[in-house]
């Protein structure tokens, strides 16, 4: 899926109470990455222990929960036939819970990437104002490096970009890195460690909730949630989840 460059935050690890929530009461907001799903299933069946609780938030007006963190744990448990998972319920609209986005970047041949994007039916248009347009949510992505390109569209176009980058990374055609901060991507670009970065507008919490209410999902790694704490490890036997 690519390497993550996570900003350094001083977030405490905290022992928190968890409750068991039925898996069919949970709603995803992002597409899955097959490799991550397989890795979770291998890990949890190998150890027989579920150690990282789901992080959920109540969907307003519904008896359902938004998956804030834990998409692959949720899908993996479902695949194994489990019925529930230990979960920490967050106050999603609290100021302590932040939502940002990830910025996919690559080292590789720009022309090859552009060609693959166009094969997916995407437009890639040179545009010096692409970054500003992306930040305002007027286009799917800005592709920024030595030159600047606009990729028009919305959610569906973002999914196509994600698919192309994932495939090219698996094929070894590009080195794919996800940045939590644009500034870090620019620093690495100046050092020659990456060639281009894709920039998009981060979704708001309201947009995330509206999306799940419609039964839709973002492309993988669209949201980057930052919480006031990291939940401490738990020790729940896998067999207890069936």
From Swiss-Prot:
Record bears the keyword tRNA processing: no
Keyword Transmembrane helix: no
Effect annotated for changing residue 36 to A: Decrease in activity
Pathway: Amino-acid biosynthesis; L-cysteine biosynthesis; L-cysteine from L-serine: step 1/2
Taxonomic superkingdom: Archaea
Phenotype on disruption: Disruption of gene does not lead to complete Cys auxotrophy, but mutant displays a growth defect in an amino acid medium depleted of Cys.
Major enzyme class: transferase
GO biological process, one term: cysteine biosynthetic process
Purpose: Free serine kinase that uses ADP to phosphorylate L-serine to yield O-phospho-L-serine and AMP.
Record-given protein name: ADP-dependent L-serine kinase SerK
